[in-house]
Amino acid sequence: MKKILMGLLATGLVSGFTACTDLEPTLYSNLTTSNAYITEKDFNAALVGVYADLNPFPGDAWQYYAGYFVMITDYTTDIGYSTSSDPLAMSVMSYDSNNQYLRDNWRYIYQVVSNANTVLQKLNNAEVDMTEENKQLIAAQLKFLRALAYRDLTDAFGPVPLVTEYAENPLAMRDMPLTSVADIDAFILKDLKEALEVLPEKWTGTDLSRATKGAAATLIGQIYMRAHDYQNAKTYIDMVLALRDKGIYSLNPDFKNVWAESNKYDMGSIFCILHEVTSNGGEIANHFGPSDHPEVQGRWQFYAISLPFWRKYDDADPRKQFFYFNYTGVSPRDDKTDYGFYYMMPEKGQNTPPNDTTKLLLNVATKKYTYEMVSDLYYDGSTISIFRLADVILCKAEIENNLNGPGAALPYLNEIRERAGAPLYGKDPRFPVPASQEAMNQAILDERGFELVFEYKRRPDLIRFGKYEETVNAHLKEMDITGTTVTPDMRYLPYPMTETKLNSYMEAENPKRLPK
């Protein structure tokens, strides 16, 4: 079976380049390293393998966008909360550089970079019977995937080694200097703009979830937004909204149906990962689904929402009900009865259940990845959203507010709330129109949390809006969690210990990033 050298930093960028990983188990047959890149079919198979790295399968079907990524995007914020081991450490800001979620996210994200580098370099050097158009199309998708991975790495870790080619000598990668976020942005923006010219507006059939013009424009716009370059961001976010005007995208009128398993590719989807139970099923339902629930059975509630964040939803917002709470479990509570415990959402400050047959929830599971499931098998058919139209509309609200003020942002903010059935700003007396740019930014940030919860957005959002330390410290106080005060140095996570042992630049940087 064909295996591609995997580029991971330090233990990745050194030992990882001598390790191997299957790119796509059903496509490679008897290919070897020497004969893997001969035909156009070979390159398309390798490309599919790089897409698969976003959501490794089988065996690692919980890594990167299949769930693990949430630990460095929605945990270490006010959203994610778990009660055991390394997830608890991420929840309460007591993590260290040996935390498995830092180590494994780093490893799997760099796997995308490395495999994209390998295929791109082989593609550029290959003499293969392929049209120039098809060659450019494969390259454009690889550049998009590599750019997405670098965006995710720099969101989490800031400066990282910029690796753009296949490493013939892995030892040369040891102790690589760190490249600034600005320089990495310049590199991936160039790649993305080249890809934008080549990628189609949409794909069909089995290629439906591949990278498109809309996906590339969304990523470009969000990279500019991260740098607070709202003028350039507007150009690319407006491109995506123009595609909506052409009928490429539209908002599903029911926010819940965005997540129905039968709705594999939602009309508002811009870039996503599709699953089929029988071929490439995921484990996202296992990790995000409710524990001991009568309708969604056999799930673990491993990743869940903090109760203080859930309480921020207005009671009149239907999205507040899109979680699992106040239900009777299916597992008998003891050997004397067939009845399960009642899992109750506690009132704020309530610490004691009303009786011995009730358990107070410590966190709450979202319905996003288990809504109207078609199958109750271990592997699920849930779709994982990476970019969707609601996100882009809220990006537009943020851009307009920062360029033109609250009035220009209001229609876009209310568009998302209206679709959800939530009270509208300026229509409900409890929600007056935010009068200042600062107040509107807070409203947009809040709305991004409500709409995009557990979609890998929260930590980058809080940092971009300049609200990370304030929000997380207030959250820790409300949770009565002591011992850590979040500082600006903690906006970037510590580099994994496995990497710092082989990279002096990371080792020198890490102490200030650790919780104190």
Regions found by a protein language model. Name each.
Residues 44, 48, 52-58, 82-157, ...:
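Conserved, well-structured interaction surfaces
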Residues 4, 8, 20-71, 108, ...:
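Acidic, glycine-rich segments characteristic of secretory precursors and extracytoplasmic regions
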Residues 34, 61-82, 163-165, 200-219, ...:
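Short, surface-exposed recognition loops and adjoining beta-strand edges that mediate ligand/DNA contacts
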Residues 42, 47, 55-58, 76-108, ...:
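Elongated scaffold/linker segments in the mid-to-C-terminal portions of large proteins
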